[in-house]
């Protein structure tokens, strides 16, 4: 399928954000009523389009990578920018998994007869129009678009300027595929100009939810400058607590994976807390494997005395490095580890390494994070690895959705009440009575 954009596509791209959002609000009910088969067919066509146009995608990404290199973009960001065969395979696998998942729409979570002939249902439905502002990751554009298609949501997408060429080609492939199978033309829109972010923030009449992905400063800016509900997370200051009852070999493998498997990810570990009773024996082993994997480390005064490294200031434990750097601190036990995590962490994903079930239970119940793990890498905090097909982001909020936000987090619900001429006055005057029977 050619990615050449038609006249309608180009005219949409030239419209104001306010006008686009208004059109998408009108298209939203039409997308919501599509069948799961129609939406799955659209996803299949998206996958086919991406594979058919992969050379154009890679060429565009090469331009973005060259520009980023010339601008001395940080290595952590450069890693996110790259879209190669591996990334293409990953997003296509994610689409396949999404297709295999059941329809998130029309699912009943309540069926109750209020009275004879008066029946209430609570049924899942799309949120409506969602604005997603994401960082310099072209694969995120594919994941987010796919999730919105499957969940029946219209999406306004604004990617980072660092991948403007890659995002343009990817979006043209996706939009053309979606329209060709009969989904509304205004199902998806790509915002390309920086000033369109502020225009989007003002579209509270037409946009139902914003999902920003980026720095803490950026997410706070979004929250402070819009009336639209915002879902998402800012930092990913993830922790691992090394308990005195941990399996050392298992622990070292997990720590290395959590730090180095994909350093630039928000679910990479940034701080390691070590029980003081095992510090003398464990820290030298840790230092050896970190050095072997080119990970530098900073530590609290007590840990630094053993490691012979830089001493950290207390406030530095808030730092999200997104790099091959690890903060290390000694703690007296699980309670102090929990206090540290709940204070310095970002409520993203935190892990305990221990073979003691009682200690693990305390940690799992008391750490106030979206993901709380035992004996596994924090890198598992991901929609694809959870079997969600993909994720629109990771939410550290406690309302609506928490953790990796897949299909379930992309829907809300409505109440459907079916009657036969029932009026409230009959119940207010005692002519009729509710009997509330769950069906």
Model-inferred region functions:
Residues 2-120, 147:
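N-terminal Rossmann-like NAD(P)+-binding subdomain of aldehyde/semialdehyde dehydrogenases
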Residues 36-40, 105, 181-188, 261-268, ...:
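Flexible, glycine/charged-enriched surface loops at secondary-structure junctions
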Residues 27-33, 272-274, 323-332, 347-352:
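Short, well-ordered beta-strand elements within core beta-sheets of diverse protein domains
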Residues 241-244, 273-276, 331, 353-355, ...:
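Short beta-strand-to-turn element immediately C-terminal to the catalytic PLP-Schiff-base lysine
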Residues 41, 339, 343-439:
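C-terminal core of ALDH-fold dehydrogenases
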Residues 15-16, 135-139, 143-154, 169, ...:
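ALDH superfamily catalytic-core signature
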Residues 100, 109-249:
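Rossmann-like NAD(P) dinucleotide-binding subdomain of oxidoreductase/dehydrogenase enzymes
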């Amino acid at each position: 399928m050619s990615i050449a954009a038609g006249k309608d596509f180009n005219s949409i791209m030239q419209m104001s954000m306010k006008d686009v959002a208004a059109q998408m609000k009108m298209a939203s009910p039409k997308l919501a009523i599509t069948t799961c088969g129609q939406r799955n067919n659209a996803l299949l066509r998206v996958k086919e389009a991406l594979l058919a146009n992969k050379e154009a995608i890679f060429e565009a990404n090469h331009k973005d990578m060259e520009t980023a290199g010339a601008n001395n973009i940080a290595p952590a960001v450069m890693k996110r920018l790259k879209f190669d065969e591996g990334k293409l395979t990953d997003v296509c696998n994610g689409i396949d998994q999404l297709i295999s998942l059941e329809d998130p729409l029309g699912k009943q979570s309540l069926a109750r007869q209020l009275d004879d002939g008066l029946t209430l249902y609570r049924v899942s439905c799309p949120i409506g129009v969602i604005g997603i502002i994401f960082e310099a990751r072209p694969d995120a554009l594919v994941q987010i678009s796919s999730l919105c298609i499957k969940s029946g949501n219209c999406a306004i997408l604004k990617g980072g300027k660092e991948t403007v060429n890659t995002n343009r080609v990817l979006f043209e492939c996706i939009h053309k595929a979606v329209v060709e199978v009969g989904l509304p033309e205004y199902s998806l829109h790509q915002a390309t100009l920086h000033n369109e972010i502020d225009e989007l923030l003002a579209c509270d009449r037409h946009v139902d939810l914003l999902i920003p992905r980026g720095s803490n400063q950026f997410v706070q800016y979004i929250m402070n400058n819009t009336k639209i509900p915002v879902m998402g997370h800012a930092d990913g200051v993830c922790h691992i607590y090394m308990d005195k009852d941990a399996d050392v070999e298992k622990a070292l493998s997990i720590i290395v994976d959590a730090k180095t498997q994909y350093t630039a990810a928000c679910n990479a570990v940034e701080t390691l807390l070590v029980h003081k009773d095992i510090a003398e024996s464990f820290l030298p082993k840790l230092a050896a494997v970190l050095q072997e994997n080119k990970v530098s480390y900073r530590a609290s005064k007590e840990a630094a005395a053993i490691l012979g490294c830089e001493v950290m200031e207390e406030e530095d434990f808030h730092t999200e490095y997104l790099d091959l750097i690890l903060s290390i601190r000694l703690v007296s036990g699980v309670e102090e580890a929990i206090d540290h995590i709940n204070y310095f962490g970002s409520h993203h994903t935190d892990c305990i390494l221990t073979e003691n079930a009682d200690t693990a239970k305390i940690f799992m119940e008391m750490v106030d994070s979206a993901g709380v793990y035992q004996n596994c890498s924090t890198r598992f905090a991901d929609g694809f690895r959870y079997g969600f097909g993909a994720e629109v982001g990771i939410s550290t909020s406690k309302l609506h959705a928490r953790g990796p936000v897949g299909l379930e987090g992309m829907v809300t619900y409505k109440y459907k009440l079916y009657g036969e001429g029932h009026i409230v006055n009959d119940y207010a005057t005692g002519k009729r009575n509710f009997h509330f029977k769950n069906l």
